[in-house]
Amino acid sequence: YQGEFAGAVEAASSTGGQIMPPIMGAAAFLMAEMVGVQYGEIAMRAIFPALLYFTGIFITVHLEAKRLGLKGIPKDELPKFGPLFVRQGYLLIPLVALVAMVMMGYTMSRAAIIATALAILVSMPNKETRMNPTRFINALEAGGKNTLSVAVACGVAGIIAGVVTMTGLGQLLISAIVGVAGDRVIVALFLTMLTCIVLGMGVPTTANYIIMATTCAPILVNGMGINKIAANMFVFYFGIVADITPPVALAAYAGSAIAKSNPMKTGITATKLAIAAFIVPYIFAYSPAMLFVNVTSVFKVIQIVLSALLGIFGVAAALNGYILRKSNWFERILLFAGGLTLMIPGTISDLIGLVLIGGIVLLQYFQRKKAAA
């Protein structure tokens, strides 16, 4: 892979860690407070969007590897999972316990204390991982430092919320966006997205989310009738992707430093890799069933997720310009259109998108088969 692509993969993947359950970014804990639910519920509702995000990255990386003709590591050179799991699998016990306790409704403080105690216990059998007094003190110090940013963000959250309420700034912003959007939800979502991205350029995710959750999220909830969890998740997502969106793209700068690549090109490539993060929030804003909100049937959830997955594949293939062979511009336009069509709620739009993308895939398959004959 080229340096820009490698740096972009690092930036997009690490940024996605904030939206991936079970342990999401600090802003997710603030979201739980804002919405008034347990953190475990936020993590549960974020599963499908996060999986779609990383699936989109995987698809793009795979298509890029196919385009460049890269081959994987031979099977006999891969590390054996079984022996490795037997030797070190017990180290997963604290993480598994933490996830289980969060999902069972334990408070985060209680779950964290129990998981920390388990981490100390499982470190004992191995001399290399054993928590001696020095390591224990260093761990406490690191934990204290890491909690400072969250503690400050929680303190600032109340101040910002108070300022927005007392000065009428929130109502002013609501009136401005609703005035431009009218009753067009897509316009309100787009304006909110732009606000989140612009505000998030260089602003920490937690601070960005606090501001957006107290200003723009109420616009979507009160002005457009969007579900409260979906609205907060919407601003949460776009506050995060601001880290990989040029021209600032702080995560892309970090990735480019590691890969020794051009920061701006790395940011543009990272945006392509993370294209799912720019699309999926619109889907769950219109179809909150993806977040397990207002679910009428399991089939409906499956349909929404599968159509979103195929749509992400279409858009990723269009941006990458390769499926089974190099795609021409006409094929890329059809793939992009098919991908976007699949993300519009409705069976008819799903069928149209499926025909467009499926047609291009079949065309390339038969052309490649004919060329090989």
Where are the regions that the model predicts?
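Membrane-interfacial loop-to-helix junctions in multi-pass transporters
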Residues: Y1-F5, V86-L92, G144-A151, A176-M193, ...
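Alpha-helical transmembrane segments of multi-pass membrane proteins
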Residues: Y1-G16, I42-R45, L51, V185-L199, ...
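Hydrophobic transmembrane alpha-helices that form the pore/transport pathway of multi-pass ion
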Residues: Y1-G17, A27, G36, T205-F238, ...
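Alpha-helical transmembrane segments of multipass membrane proteins
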Residues: T15, A26, L30-M34, V99-A100, ...
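Short helix-coil transition sites and intra-membrane helix breaks within transmembrane domains
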Residues: G17-I23, L148, G162-G168, R184, ...
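Membrane-interface helix termini and inter-helical loops of multi-pass transporters
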Residues: Q38, V164-V180, P288-K300
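Long, contiguous bundles of hydrophobic transmembrane helices that form the permeation core
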Residues: M44-N146, L250-L340, R368, A372
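Core transmembrane alpha-helical segments of multi-pass membrane transporters/permeases
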Residues: S109, I113, T134-Q171, V185, ...
